[in-house]
C-alpha cells in the first residue's frame, strides 16, 4: 500500500523541482513565450509517450509507472496527460472526440482561468 504512494510522491517532488528549475532558467530568456513552460510541456509529452509505450511492453513493477507517469510527469506538467489522452483517441480513430477534447481542454482552461481571476477580483472587491 505504501509503495505506490511513495512512488508517486518521489516522482512528484522531482518533477516539480525540474519544472521550477527550468522556469527559473528559461522563462527570462524570452518572457513573451515562457520557454520553461513550453519546455516542460514538450518534454513531459515526450516522456509520457515514451513511458506509456515502454510500460505497455514491460514486466517492471507497476510502481515504476506510477513514479514516472503519475508522479514525475504529473508534477512536471499536466499537459503530458492531456497529450497521451488525445493521442490515444486519435490512435483509436476517434478524431471527432479528440478534436472535442482538445477544444474543451484549451478553451475551457482559458475560460476557467478568466473565471478564477474574475472571482478573485470580485471577492477582493477590486
Curated annotation (Swiss-Prot):
Transmembrane segments: 4-24, 33-53, 67-87, 97-117
Record InterPro entries: FluC
UniProt record similarity statement: Belongs to the fluoride channel Fluc/FEX (TC 1.A.43) family.
Gene Ontology BP terms: cellular detoxification of fluoride
Alphabetized UniProt keyword annotations: Cell inner membrane, Cell membrane, Ion channel, Ion transport, Membrane, Metal-binding, Sodium, Transmembrane, Transmembrane helix, Transport
Name recorded for this polypeptide: Fluoride-specific ion channel FluC
Swiss-Prot/TrEMBL catalytic activity: fluoride(in) = fluoride(out)
Molecular-function GO terms, alphabetical: fluoride channel activity; metal ion binding
Main subcellular location: membrane
Residues binding Na(+), per UniProt: 74, 77
Gene designation per UniProt: fluC
Organism whose genome encodes this protein: Acinetobacter baumannii (strain AYE)
NCBIfam families: crcB, PRK14196.1
Subcellular location: Cell inner membrane
One GO location term (cellular component): plasma membrane
Lineage per the UniProt record: Bacteria, Pseudomonadati, Pseudomonadota, Gammaproteobacteria, Moraxellales
Reported regulation of activity: Na(+) is not transported, but it plays an essential structural role and its presence is essential for fluoride channel function.
Purpose of the protein: Fluoride-specific ion channel. Important for reducing fluoride concentration in the cell, thus reducing its toxicity.
Mode of membrane association: Multi-pass membrane protein
